[in-house]
């Protein structure tokens, strides 16, 4: 096994909350998958949830070496949690095709947040 890609991103929660306040649900829909939107709509701390997903997806796109560009969109990534609460990152669309071309067999995601910031790191492994 070898590391094929590494990406990290940090998001200021207040900045995401302000954008959400200005643009509302359309802003969230631009970032979140359908499954993530279903959970988002039930939460009280929507800005924090959105900031963590934003950081995770940015980190994943950086690990691919593209950023959110070259056909890779936020919707190419879905973040969920396993039965123990560990974050799980699923790739689809262009991101999935790029990962397959790179020889990615394992995707690792870590997300942390505190009062002001959410941070995520993604490792793509063969």
Swiss-Prot record:
State the reactions this protein catalyses: apo-[ACP] + CoA = holo-[ACP] + adenosine 3',5'-bisphosphate + H(+)
- A single MF term (Gene Ontology): magnesium ion binding
Top EC group: transferase
Record's GO cellular component terms? cytoplasm
Pfam families for the chain: ACPS
Q: What does this protein need as cofactor? A: Mg(2+)
* GO BP term, pick one: fatty acid biosynthetic process
Q: Which InterPro entries match?
A: 4-PPantetheinyl_Trfase_dom, 4-PPantetheinyl_Trfase_dom_sf, ACPS, Ppantetheine-prot_Trfase_dom
Query: What does the protein in this record do?
Result: Transfers the 4'-phosphopantetheine moiety from coenzyme A to a Ser of acyl-carrier-protein.
- Say which family it is in: Belongs to the P-Pant transferase superfamily. AcpS family.
* Protein's UniProt name: Holo-[acyl-carrier-protein] synthase
């Amino acid at each position: 096994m070898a590391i094929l890609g590494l990406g990290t991103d940090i998001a200021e929660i207040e900045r995401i909350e302000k954008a959400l306040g200005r643009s509302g649900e359309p802003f969230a829909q631009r970032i979140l998958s359908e499954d993530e939107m279903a959970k988002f709509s039930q939460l009280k701390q929507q800005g924090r949830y959105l900031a963590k997903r934003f950081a995770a997806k940015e980190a994943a796109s950086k690990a691919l070496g593209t950023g959110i560009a070259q056909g890779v969109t936020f919707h190419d990534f879905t973040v969920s949690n396993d039965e123990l609460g560990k974050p799980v990152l699923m790739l689809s669309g262009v991101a999935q095709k790029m990962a397959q071309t790179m020889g990615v067999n394992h995707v690792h995601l870590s997300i942390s947040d505190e009062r002001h910031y959410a941070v995520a790191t993604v490792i793509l492994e063969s």
